[in-house]
């Protein structure tokens, strides 16, 4: 049986799966901010609880992320703004439809950020090229995707597959490990680009 596409997995996920999927996308993009804090830790801690602690932990994460500064150039400022928007857009209500919309938006934003990093500082992709690549990724046909966006797509799929198995805290820990791997990759890319631009 063929694997499900990213769009299909998001459409079938429950509240916890959607919240964790969006959160994981956001976490993998954090190296684009020059911050040593872990603004999403409280949200990860509260995911197993579900609706009860979500609004308060979300507010705490927003406050922490608001103080994180981008690395200091125009491109980084744009990425930082997108990351903050991803968290600001998270719904306070623990309901499947708003969470699905948020998870979907986070998926697109994370893929877009990785696609722009694939292009490099001198090769900003056109809007039409970005749309084409993202559409292919989400529908299971990433034919023109670079290595970073391909790896991010693979992690998004893996996260949703883990969450679909419904293994509670064990599954959430597995998801965090996947996201930590993605963070390490992106942090190395950001560090390498910073050295080149000096």
Where do the PLM segments sit?
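Structured binding/interaction patches within domain cores
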Residues: 19-174
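Low-complexity intrinsically disordered segments
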Residues: 161-198
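Short, extreme N-terminal leader segments that mark the start of a protein/domain
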Residues: 1-30
């Amino acid at each position: 049986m063929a694997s499900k596409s990213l769009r299909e997995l998001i459409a079938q996920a429950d509240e916890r799966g959607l919240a964790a999927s969006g959160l994981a996308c956001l976490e993998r993009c954090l190296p684009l901010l020059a911050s040593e804090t872990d603004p999403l830790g409280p949200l990860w801690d509260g995911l197993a609880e579900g609706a009860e602690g979500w609004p308060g932990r979300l507010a705490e994460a927003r406050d922490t992320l608001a103080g994180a500064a981008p690395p200091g150039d125009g491109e980084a400022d744009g990425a930082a703004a997108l990351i903050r928007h991803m968290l600001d857009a998270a719904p306070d209500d623990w309901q499947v439809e708003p969470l699905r919309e948020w998870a979907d938006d986070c998926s697109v934003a994370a893929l877009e950020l990785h696609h722009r990093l694939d292009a490099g500082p001198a090769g900003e992709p056109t809007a039409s090229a970005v749309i084409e690549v993202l559409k292919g990724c989400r529908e299971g046909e990433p034919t023109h995707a670079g290595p970073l966006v391909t790896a991010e797509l693979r992690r998004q799929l893996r996260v949703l597959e883990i969450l679909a198995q419904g293994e509670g805290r064990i599954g959430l820990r597995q998801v965090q490990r996947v996201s930590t791997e993605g963070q390490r990759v992106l942090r190395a890319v950001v560090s390498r680009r910073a050295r080149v631009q000096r």
